[in-house]
């Protein structure tokens, strides 16, 4: 049980120790991202929970900042990931991506990222109160792409690792590397100087640590883990050592013995191994069990799949419970507890994303309910980098094929452009900004300057006229009681604005700062002592008001001759209870100069460490009211308002009406008078703080330049509970005010303040500008201006062009000179068009308006450049006539040339030459034909187009300077010329005798719709009996009564053409009885509907005689196929034929075939043609060879039917043949217009016009490039080789470098290019893909001088430097070196210069400058910080670029952005006054230089007479001072530029210029001047000191006794004591002797002044105010006389002080007096008759009548020793020689075991009974003595002197022992007796020793009596108990004694 209590105590001690500060553990790791210079950094830290009060997992906490190693840093806001409530720590993590500067290709750069702060735990056995420094080595590698770049190692540890003192402890640092697992090395850190725990080693290969601590306590350690490429991380944690009781190993000689260290186990066989403990544990700690991952194990987690692991631990004791604590768990892990109790199990699960790739080391610890812990278990979760991220797979080409919106360039680890986040979501709209895209982006739109809104579509600008007073921007602080704390407000003129202020005040304040200002010049030390004594009550009372209360302390002294206005003692956050106790006032006086108000003014404005977001109170304690003038009172009030500090004033024992009046007048604060008691002032001060915190008082700061704009404040009120409300502050800007950048400060007294920067409208500005334009050209321009308030500007012309100069039109085409009062927007584009050939310079002027006010006017100068004008041509239209030549007369003109110098070129004659001959001077016209005046051409049409058409032929004129005109057209109108039809019919036509037949007349025409048939002539037979007629049903010759007989010149009605064929059937009958050849005939023509008549056709008629006839037989044509649109007819001809059994009709052997083939049904999808003449087949003598031609575009099956008839018109059956038309691929076609462009044209994309009958895709290519003209493909890529594919069948042109144009640059170029196209088809029969015909296209470039181009330029330079710069300008005609600039305005905040000096208004108006000629120098001290928003460019100028022809670019601007280079500024005191022997808190606050970003400090030197400390406020843990031992010492840990130090002068030294401190302030690479703070150590009257020297007891020995470690005077009853002491004072101004007084007169005894040695008693000191004068020897004396006859311990106490001339009192020294009784020695009485005995051996004799007495021993014990000694010496004889016995009774006795001796302790009566009878028997004859020794043990003396006041008495009885005179006697008797005596002596010694030990326990006597060595000798002589008592009278402490022994 005792051991358990012991261990619990040790454990609790460690808990207390570990609360000393807040840092526990840290490590930093990093990983690359898809951009090599964007590094993801992860910081894992552990802190003490109590520093934050309490934390919860997932909570956000902030602490310190991280330095990225590139002069940038950021504050850390971390997420709590785990916590240990038993040991009161938690872990937190921060992760962020930092962008480092890009590196050149294939280069690396190393950075060190650091998290550093102070201070470590004070009680560490190493590194106590030192900085912690957590770092990682980062490598930026531009040579590799993600994910191949290096990653840092990753490690982890429990924040506190428990180890056993004096035993070997083993634990392992587990680390993992995403790149290579076996390449890590381990060692103690070398990145920061720190002490490692002694006895600890680290294995460099596997991270095994061995530690044999020899002390209990806490150590810190830091291990560095480095990979093969040099990237490193560290892990910093604590080692807690404790002692544990175990047992020794069985191999030891003291096996199973209890032990606490290995060294206590001896002779063990396994000694010497650093891995084995010979002292092993008794209790078994809990252990991790399966399925917990093994130590060092790596678990792979796949991406996008849920994975899990378990932690399970168990204690072997059923009565205990187990719990698991983890460190730095990834926030994505989900936790589930699966079991609790003796076994504890938890489950973690995770479905990681690609963004989580990396390694995560998890550390865990198992604890049982008794406090025993397991070893640390660490393992790794590893999320592997796949070859392709986010679901991508590797393709056959080795590249990643990504899904979704992941980018193959980054192996699917990065989003494509336009997407963001871990799911690559589409970026939302971002109209005027840059979207934060990419896998690490959040999709938010980062707006360009002037835009806001989620999509940056809302302009920050608006018209001044529409603007209302509003908040432009504001800053809130979470910890503030009021918000916003800063705001920018726009105030419209003469309009009041109510500014909202939100108050959020909890019932218990969250933060409270109390600065205690104490009057150090109280009227007495006792008065000031009440301040000391009341401090703890004050602190504890005030702490109840807030969750976090911090205190500071300052002092002032109103002592007139040595006043101190204000002296800081301890900054906010200090332990003021200790600080006030350490402070020693320099004076005590009721005199006062009344400077308490002045002190409060300085204290309230001093840098004492006020915390942001706290309620601020200054408590002033003074015992005298203030005296001050009105100015001082006003300064006091303004200082409090400016800092928002509320005063509480305590009149300490004195009324303070002036203070009350000021507080009442100010309207805030609290005053009260308190009694001069510790309880009253502390209670009332606390009540005052409570009172002021319950009042809301609003004040406007007088020290702010914008105070006059605050017109009203909220009414104050009292609050009693939590308050959430919004109040309003009224602001109003007068119409006219001369306040520049007004700022208002409004304080809610104590609770904080809001700073309001007030903006109002300012006049816009415009600048002079200009532009130039070529003669007869045009130019566009905009009106521009700027407005400091970002208002929307509109513009108005104030002067216009002369009407002869030209016209300026708006975008709507309206002449602006007709709109004299129109305002235009800034986006309006104006067009200037000069009058034709007008070349004079013109100007216009304009103003800008912001909605409220106009700018001053600016001028735009317009310069017209005279240039050669291109000639002009006029288009012409002619009408062509088929087969007739027509003349074409062209016309052209030129401004400079006569007609004879103008030539005309036809750009592309081919559109006309396809229809006929196009000639100049009887020669065909080509593109190179030069046509001179009079420009006469001819054209003869030879091709008849199918329909009317107009054809255009482009031509241009060229002047003598080879300048071409724009393109004109020769338009030729063609009409189609009708062609006569073709008539046909079958001839001869057979007819039977006396029979009739039908004759089919056919007309074929391709350009007509109908025809009429004309019977020109006919013969009716050789006998004239034949008849030609027509039946009403055409083709039906059976009519008789309705016959219409043909007449000559008969004209039929119109017959429509069907498939280009029209037929008319006429009838013929005969009455001939026999066969007659050419019996009759008919001749006809056909006339189309356009009046053209065909040639005549004659049809003969044969009369065939009657004969037996059989119908013929048709020969069927099998199904066959033809190709669609295929023209190779020979391949598809077929023969229609038949056979006939009648040899007259058909005899193949005789070559007779009189059959007629007849088409009975024509095909529907095509046409049958005769092979011999290509006419359409209808009927024809057999065999009839035909061709089937499908109609254009058709395909599929078609049929036609046919038969044969014999000469007797007998018909065969009708046969039908199917023709399959097979679809084929058709050749594509392509066309393109000729194109010409100028140097002023933009790049237009041109497209080829393609077509394909089959609808196939057509891909075109360039097969010949134009000369001297750059041609670009569809993607805008220059074509350098042909053939070159055009992916979109589009192209564009640009001029080559002019220098490449032949014969001369900047000349016109005419050229052509050739393209063809290929279709894309799957067809292969009869052919596959087909290529179009080559198309030659003309292209021309017309040179027009192109205006130069420029763009806005921003010149970057540093403040107070000059920068040569080059204007942005380029021109295709003019080399850059020849371009010049025209400057229209000069900079306003700097100067332009060249080699000849500074430019001025005259020089810029009269000349131009080369692009690189000028240098800009800003005015001294000016930078961008001096602009309205502290960020805009400092200066600007307007300019235009001129080419060598004088043509100008548009006007543009050069901005001069002057980077502020203002180092931080120190505005504090350069001299501080430090009070002697006083710690001075020195706060150095660096103000960020204008435009700067941070403040760091380097203390360069210190003279070192005193001591300089770095000071760290640890919150509730107080303040830590770290002495600075070497210089320079750098700090950069403050985000606000405040650095705290403390100065302490050496003791009792002072003087002006006592020390100097030099330092510089740093911002990145900016270093301030060296600042020097001079330390004056002000002499402060130091209190004197008093020292006790000695005392002398008068009436005694007179010996002077020096005071030792105590101040006690021991004196006897009825004596007196003289006390001697001395007073000292180090102050040089202490001239006279110090005064001395007795603080309190003792109640017993009397104090006298010392007179002299003869008559020592001087005057009685009855009054404590009576002074004791210093004696001539420099000492002070007094005499103390106790009351006669009285005694006592602590009889009296006399406190003494000395006092200097300033009233300062030394610390008191007290003399204690013990008045002692005189101790009376004991007396032994032996009857005279009993003083000698004679006896024989072996006989017993009784010694009697022996008594003793000790007169002053009443109830206390005394000691008696009885022994047998020799006759002449004190040697105790053995009890074997002589022995004795006594009756001990109630006494406590102890006999010696071998000697004849016994010692007894008891009351006097008890011991007298012991010695009343002593029975003696001797074995050995001889002369002996019975010795009786009595010791009073000094009990009558004070304890303090008891050891020196033992008194004793000794007496003897003589023993004469002889042997009996008998013959049988032998020597054995002597032997026996001698043995008895010897035994008795030995027994006596043992009894004495035993009694000594017993007495030592029973009653603590002095060391001299009870020393352990007293009984270690061979005899009793060495024991002081056996020292013989001398005569009592010889002892000066004895009373007189009559006893003689």
From Swiss-Prot:
Where does the chain cross the membrane? 1872-1892
Q: How does it assemble?
A: Interacts with talA/talin.
Protein role = Implicated in cellular adhesion.
Topological domain ranges for the Extracellular compartment: 21-1871
- Where in or outside the cell is it found? Membrane
Q: Name one GO cellular component term.
A: membrane
Bilayer topology term: Single-pass type I membrane protein
Q: Does the keyword Transmembrane helix apply?
A: yes
- Which residues, renumbered to this chain, are glycosylated? 1400, 1505, 1530, 1606, 1652, 1738, 1777, 1848, 1866, 1869
**What's the protein called, per UniProt?**
Integrin beta-like protein B
């Amino acid at each position: 049980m005792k051991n358990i209590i012991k261990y619990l105590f040790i454990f609790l001690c460690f808990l207390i120790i570990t609360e000393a500060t807040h840092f526990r553990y840290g490590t930093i790791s990093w990983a690359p991202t898809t951009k090599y210079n964007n590094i993801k950094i992860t910081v894992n830290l552990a802190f003490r929970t109590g520093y934050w009060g309490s934390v919860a997992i997932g909570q956000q906490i902030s602490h310190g900042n991280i330095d990225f190693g590139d002069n940038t840093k950021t504050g850390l806001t971390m997420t709590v990931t785990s916590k240990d409530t038993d040991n009161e720590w938690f872990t937190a993590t921060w992760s962020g991506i930092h962008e480092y500067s890009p590196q050149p290709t294939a280069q690396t750069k190393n950075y060190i990222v650091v998290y550093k702060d102070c201070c470590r735990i004070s009680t560490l056995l190493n590194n106590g109160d030192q900085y912690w420094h957590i770092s990682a080595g980062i490598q930026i590698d531009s040579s590799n792409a993600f994910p191949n770049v290096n990653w840092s190692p990753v490690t982890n540890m429990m924040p506190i690792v428990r180890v056993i003192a004096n035993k070997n402890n083993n634990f392992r640092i587990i680390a993992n590397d995403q790149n290579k697992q076996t390449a890590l090395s381990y060692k103690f850190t070398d990145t920061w100087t720190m002490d490692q725990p002694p006895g600890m080693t680290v294995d460099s290969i596997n991270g095994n640590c061995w530690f044999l601590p020899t002390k209990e306590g806490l150590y810190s350690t830091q291990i560095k883990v480095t990979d093969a490429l040099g990237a490193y991380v560290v892990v910093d944690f604590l080692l807690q050592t404790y002692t544990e009781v175990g047992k020794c190993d069985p191999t030891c000689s003291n096996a199973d013995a209890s032990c606490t260290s290995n060294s206590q186990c001896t002779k063990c066989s396994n000694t010497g191994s650093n891995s084995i403990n010979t002292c092993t544990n008794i209790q078994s700690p809990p252990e991790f069990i399966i399925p917990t991952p093994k130590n060092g194990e790596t678990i792979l987690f796949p991406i996008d799949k849920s994975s899990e692991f378990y932690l399970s631990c168990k204690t072997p004791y059923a009565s205990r419970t187990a719990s698991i604590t983890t460190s730095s768990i990834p926030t994505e892990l989900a936790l589930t507890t699966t079991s609790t109790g003796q076994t504890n199990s938890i489950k973690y699960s995770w479905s990681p994303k690609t963004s989580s790739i990396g390694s995560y080391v998890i550390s865990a610890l198992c604890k049982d309910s008794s406090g025993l812990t397991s070893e640390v278990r660490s393992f790794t979760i590893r999320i592997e980098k796949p070859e392709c991220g986010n679901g991508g797979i590797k393709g056959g080409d080795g590249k990643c094929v990504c899904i979704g919106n992941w980018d193959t360039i980054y192996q699917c680890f990065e989003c494509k452009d336009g997407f963001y986040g871990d799911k690559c979501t589409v970026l939302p709209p971002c109209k005027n900004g840059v979207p934060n895209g990419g896998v690490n982006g959040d999709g938010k739109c980062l707006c360009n300057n002037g835009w806001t809104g989620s999509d940056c579509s809302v302009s920050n600008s608006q018209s001044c006229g529409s603007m209302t007073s509003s908040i432009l921007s504001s800053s809130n602080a979470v910890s503030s009681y009021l918000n916003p704390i800063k705001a920018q407000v726009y105030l419209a003129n003469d309009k009041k604005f109510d500014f909202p202020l939100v108050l959020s005040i909890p019932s218990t304040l969250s933060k409270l700062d109390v600065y205690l200002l104490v009057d150090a010049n109280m009227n007495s030390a006792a008065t000031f002592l009440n301040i000391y004594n009341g401090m703890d009550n004050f602190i504890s009372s005030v702490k109840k008001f807030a969750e976090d209360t911090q205190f500071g302390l300052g002092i002032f002294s109103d002592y007139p001759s040595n006043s101190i206005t204000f002296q800081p003692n301890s900054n906010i956050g200090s332990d003021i209870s200790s600080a006030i106790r350490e402070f020693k006032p320099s004076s005590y006086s009721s005199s006062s100069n009344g400077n308490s108000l002045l002190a409060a003014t300085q204290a309230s404005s001093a840098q004492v460490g006020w915390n942001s977001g706290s309620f601020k109170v200054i408590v002033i304690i003074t015992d005298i009211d203030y005296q001050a003038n009105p100015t001082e009172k006003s300064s006091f009030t303004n200082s409090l308002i400016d800092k928002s500090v509320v005063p509480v004033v305590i009149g300490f024992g004195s009324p303070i009406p002036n203070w009350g009046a000021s507080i009442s007048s100010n309207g805030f604060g609290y005053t009260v008078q308190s009694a001069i008691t510790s309880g009253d002032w502390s209670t009332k001060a606390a009540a005052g703080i409570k009172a002021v915190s319950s009042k809301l008082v609003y004040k406007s700061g007088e020290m702010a330049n914008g105070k006059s704009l605050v017109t009203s404040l909220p009414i104050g009120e009292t609050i009693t509970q939590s308050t959430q409300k919004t109040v309003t502050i009224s602001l109003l800007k007068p119409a006219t005010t001369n306040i520049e950048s007004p700022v208002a400060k409004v304080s809610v007294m104590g609770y904080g303040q809001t700073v309001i920067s007030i903006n109002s409208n300012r006049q816009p500005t415009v600048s002079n500008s200009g532009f130039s334009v070529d003669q007869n050209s045009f130019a566009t321009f905009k009106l521009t201006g700027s407005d400091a308030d970002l208002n929307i500007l509109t513009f108005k012309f104030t002067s216009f062009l002369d009407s002869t100069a030209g016209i300026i039109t708006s975008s709507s085409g309206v002449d602006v000179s007709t709109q004299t009062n129109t305002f235009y927007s800034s986006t309006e584009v104006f067009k200037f068009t000069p009058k034709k050939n007008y070349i004079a310079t013109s100007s216009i002027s304009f103003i800008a308006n912001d909605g409220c006010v106009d700018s001053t006017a600016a001028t735009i100068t317009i310069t017209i450049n005279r240039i050669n004008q291109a000639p002009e041509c006029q288009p012409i239209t002619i009408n062509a006539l088929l087969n007739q030549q027509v003349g074409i007369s062209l016309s052209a003109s030129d401004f400079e040339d006569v007609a004879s110098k103008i030539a005309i070129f036809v750009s592309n004659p081919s559109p006309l030459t396809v229809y006929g001959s196009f000639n100049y001077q009887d020669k065909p016209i080509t593109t190179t034909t030069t046509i001179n005046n009079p420009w006469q051409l001819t054209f003869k049409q030879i091709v008849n187009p199918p329909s009317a058409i107009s054809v255009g032929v482009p031509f241009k004129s060229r002047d003598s300077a080879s300048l071409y005109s724009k393109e004109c057209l020769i338009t030729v109108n063609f009409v189609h010329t009708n062609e006569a039809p073709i008539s046909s019919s079958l001839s001869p036509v057979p007819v039977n005798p006396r029979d009739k037949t039908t004759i089919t007349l056919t007309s074929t025409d391709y350009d007509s719709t109908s025809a009429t048939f004309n019977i020109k002539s006919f013969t009716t037979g050789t006998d004239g009996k034949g008849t030609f007629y027509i039946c009403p049903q055409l083709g039906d010759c059976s009519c008789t009564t309705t016959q219409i007989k043909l007449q000559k010149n008969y004209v039929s009605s119109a017959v429509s053409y069907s498939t280009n064929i029209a037929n008319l059937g006429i009838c013929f009958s005969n009455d001939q009885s026999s066969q007659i050849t050419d019996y009759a005939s008919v001749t006809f023509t056909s006339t189309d509907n356009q009046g053209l008549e065909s040639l005549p056709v004659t049809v003969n008629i044969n009369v065939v005689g009657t004969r037996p006839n059989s119908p013929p037989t048709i020969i069927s044509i099998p199904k066959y196929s033809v190709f669609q649109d295929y023209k190779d007819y020979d391949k598809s001809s077929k023969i229609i034929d038949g056979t006939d059994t009648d040899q007259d009709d058909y005899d193949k052997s005789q070559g007779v075939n009189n059959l007629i083939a007849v088409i009975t049904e024509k095909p529907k999808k095509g046409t049958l043609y005769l092979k011999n003449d290509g006419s359409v087949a209808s009927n024809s003598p057999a065999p009839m060879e035909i061709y089937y031609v499908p109609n254009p575009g058709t395909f599929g099956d078609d049929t036609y039917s046919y038969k044969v008839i014999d000469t007797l018109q007998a018909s065969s059956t009708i046969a039908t043949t199917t023709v399959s038309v097979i679809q084929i691929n058709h050749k594509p076609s392509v066309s393109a217009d000729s194109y010409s462009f100028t140097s002023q044209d933009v790049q237009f994309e041109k497209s080829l016009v393609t077509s394909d009958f089959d609808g196939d895709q057509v891909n075109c290519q360039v097969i010949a490039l134009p000369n001297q003209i750059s041609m670009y493909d569809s993607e805008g890529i220059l074509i350098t080789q042909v053939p070159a594919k055009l992916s979109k069948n589009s192209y564009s042109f640009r001029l080559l470098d002019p220098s490449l144009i032949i014969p001369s640059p900047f000349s016109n170029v005419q050229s052509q290019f050739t393209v063809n196209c290929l279709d894309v088809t799957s067809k292969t029969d009869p052919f596959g893909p087909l290529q179009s015909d080559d198309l030659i296209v003309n292209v021309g470039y017309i040179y027009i001088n192109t205006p130069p181009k420029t763009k806005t330029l921003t010149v970057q330079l540093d403040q107070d430097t000059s920068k040569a710069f080059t204007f942005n300008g380029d021109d295709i005609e003019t080399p850059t070196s020849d371009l010049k600039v025209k400057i229209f305005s000069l900079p306003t905040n700097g100067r332009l210069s060249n080699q000849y000096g500074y430019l001025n208004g005259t020089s810029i108006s009269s000349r131009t400058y080369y692009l690189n000629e000028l240098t800009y120098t800003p005015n001294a001290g000016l930078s961008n910080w001096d602009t309205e928003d502290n960020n805009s460019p400092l200066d600007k100028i307007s300019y235009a670029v001129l080419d060598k022809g004088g043509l100008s670019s548009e006007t543009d601007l050069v901005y001069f952005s002057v980077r502020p280079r203002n180092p931080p500024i120190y505005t504090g005191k350069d001299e501080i006054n430090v009070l002697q022997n006083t710690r001075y808190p020195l706060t150095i606050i660096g103000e960020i230089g204008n435009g700067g970003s941070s403040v760091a400090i380097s203390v360069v030197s210190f003279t070192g007479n005193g001591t300089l400390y770095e000071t760290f406020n640890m919150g509730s843990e107080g303040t830590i001072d770290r002495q600075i031992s070497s210089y320079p010492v750098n700090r950069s840990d403050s985000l606000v530029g405040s650095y705290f130090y403390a100065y302490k002068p050496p003791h009792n030294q002072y003087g002006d210029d006592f020390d100097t401190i030099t330092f510089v302030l740093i911002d990145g690479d900016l270093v301030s001047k060296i600042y020097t703070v001079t330390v004056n150590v002000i002499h402060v009257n130091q209190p004197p000191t008093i020292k006790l020297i000695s005392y002398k007891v008068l009436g005694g020995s007179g010996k002077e006794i020096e005071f030792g470690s105590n101040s006690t005077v021991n004196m006897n009853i009825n004596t007196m004591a003289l006390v001697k002491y001395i007073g000292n004072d180090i102050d040089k101004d202490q001239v006279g002797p110090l005064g001395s007084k007795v603080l309190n007169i003792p109640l017993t005894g009397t104090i006298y002044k010392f007179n002299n040695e003869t008559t020592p008693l001087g005057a009685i000191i009855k009054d404590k105010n009576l002074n004791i004068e210093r004696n001539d020897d420099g000492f002070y004396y007094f005499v103390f006389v106790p009351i006669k006859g009285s005694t006592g311990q602590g009889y009296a106490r006399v406190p003494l002080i000395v006092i200097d001339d300033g009233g300062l009192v030394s610390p008191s020294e007290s003399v204690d007096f013990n008045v002692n009784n005189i101790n009376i020695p004991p007396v032994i009485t032996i009857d005279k008759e009993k003083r000698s005995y004679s006896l024989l051996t072996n006989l017993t004799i009784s010694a009697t009548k022996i008594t003793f007495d000790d007169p002053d021993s009443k109830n206390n014990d005394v000691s008696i020793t009885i022994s047998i000694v020799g006759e002449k010496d004190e040697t105790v004889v053995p009890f074997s020689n002589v022995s004795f016995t006594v009756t001990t009774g109630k006494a406590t006795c102890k006999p010696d075991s071998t000697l004849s001796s016994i010692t007894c302790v008891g009351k006097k009566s008890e011991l007298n009974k012991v010695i009343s009878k002593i029975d003696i028997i001797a074995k050995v004859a001889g002369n002996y003595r019975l010795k009786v020794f009595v010791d009073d043990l000094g009990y009558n003396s004070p304890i303090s002197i008891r050891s020196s006041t033992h008194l004793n008495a000794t007496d003897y009885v003589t023993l004469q022992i002889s042997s009996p005179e008998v013959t049988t006697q032998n020597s054995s008797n002597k032997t026996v007796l001698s043995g008895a005596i010897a035994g008795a002596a030995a027994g006596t010694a043992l009894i004495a020793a035993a009694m000594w030990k017993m007495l030592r326990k029973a009653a603590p006597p002095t060391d001299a009596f009870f020393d352990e060595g007293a009984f270690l000798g061979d005899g009793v002589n060495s024991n002081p108990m056996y020292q013989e008592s001398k005569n009592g009278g010889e002892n000066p402490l004895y009373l007189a004694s009559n006893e003689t022994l």
